Regions:
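Membrane-topology and secretion signals of cell-surface/extracellular proteins
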Residues: 3-4, 45-54, 63, 78-80, ...
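Short, polar N-cap/turn motifs at the start of nucleic acid-interacting alpha helices
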Residues: 2, 73-80, 156-158, 177-200, ...
Length: 223
C-alpha cells in the first residue's frame, strides 16, 4: 500500500485559531492572462505540470483539490468533477468527525474537459490524474507548481499557484456578469449568512455551469 505525500488532516487543531486570518495571494490581472499562457506554453517542464497549472486556472480549485483528483472523480459525459468532501478545506474537519457530506460539484467547460482528456492519456494507470512523473501512484507535489511558476519568470510577489484561484475569482467578479453567490459557491466558500445547517453541494449548479463555460471561453480568447 502506497502513501500520499499530502496529510489531509494537517492543521486541523489550528482551524479555529486561524479561521479569521486571510492571506492575499499575488494573482494575474486580466491583461496578464495572454502573457501567462505564452510563458506556460514555452515552459520547459513535464506536460502534466503545465497542464496542472492550466487546469487549475480553468477550474479555480485549491491545490489539494487539484492534486488529489483521481479518474473516478470525473463524469466526462456530464462534464462534472465530483470532489470528495474530504478534499475540500471547509468540509474536511466535519468529514473526519464523522459527518456525511456529499461530493462538491465542479462544472467543467469544454476547454477544461479537453485539458483533462489530454492529461488522462499521460497518467493512464496511475492513481492520480496529475501523477508525479517520478513517483508511481503519487501526485505531483504542490511545491512543483510554484517552482514551475518561478521558472516562468514570476517572482513570489508576482504570482503563486494559489494566485490562479484569486485570478479566477477577481476576473469573474469584475466582469459584473455573475452573482456573488454563484462565484462563492464555485469557490466552495460557505455563506456565513445562510440559515441552512448543511451545505448544498449542487448550489447554483446550472448557473455555475454557464459561468464556467464563459470563463473557459474567456481564457481561450484572452490576448
Amino acid at each position: 500500500m502506497g502513501y500520499c505525500e499530502f496529510n489531509i488532516a494537517h492543521g486541523l487543531n489550528k482551524i479555529a485559531i486561524n479561521s479569521k486570518i486571510k492571506k492575499n495571494y499575488p494573482y494575474l490581472k486580466a491583461e496578464d492572462i495572454s502573457d501567462f499562457k505564452y510563458k506556460l506554453q514555452k515552459l520547459d517542464a513535464h506536460p502534466i505540470i503545465k497542464k496542472a497549472l492550466l487546469f487549475k486556472l480553468h477550474t479555480g480549485v485549491r491545490g489539494a483539490e487539484l492534486l488529489l483528483a483521481e479518474p473516478h472523480h470525473f463524469d466526462l459525459n456530464e462534464k462534472v468533477w465530483k470532489i470528495p468532501a474530504l478534499h475540500i478545506k471547509q468540509f474536511r474537519r466535519k468529514v473526519i468527525l464523522g459527518h456525511e457530506i456529499p461530493d462538491f460539484l465542479v462544472p467543467l467547460s469544454d476547454q477544461a474537459l479537453d485539458i483533462l482528456k489530454d492529461v488522462m492519456q499521460w497518467s493512464y494507470g496511475e492513481k492520480y490524474i496529475f501523477a508525479s512523473p517520478r513517483k508511481h501512484n503519487q501526485p505531483i507535489h504542490f511545491n512543483t507548481l510554484n517552482m514551475a511558476i518561478r521558472k516562468m519568470g514570476y517572482g513570489k510577489h508576482q504570482l503563486s499557484s494559489h494566485g490562479l484561484r484569486s485570478t479566477f475569482s477577481t476576473i469573474l467578479n469584475d466582469s459584473g456578469l455573475f452573482q456573488d453567490n454563484w462565484i462563492e459557491a464555485q469557490l466552495s466558500h460557505i455563506d456565513k449568512n445562510r440559515t441552512r445547517a448543511s451545505y448544498n453541494h449542487a448550489d447554483y449548479l446550472a448557473q455555475r455551469t454557464e459561468m464556467m463555460q464563459w470563463w473557459g471561453d474567456y481564457l481561450s480568447t484572452a490576448k
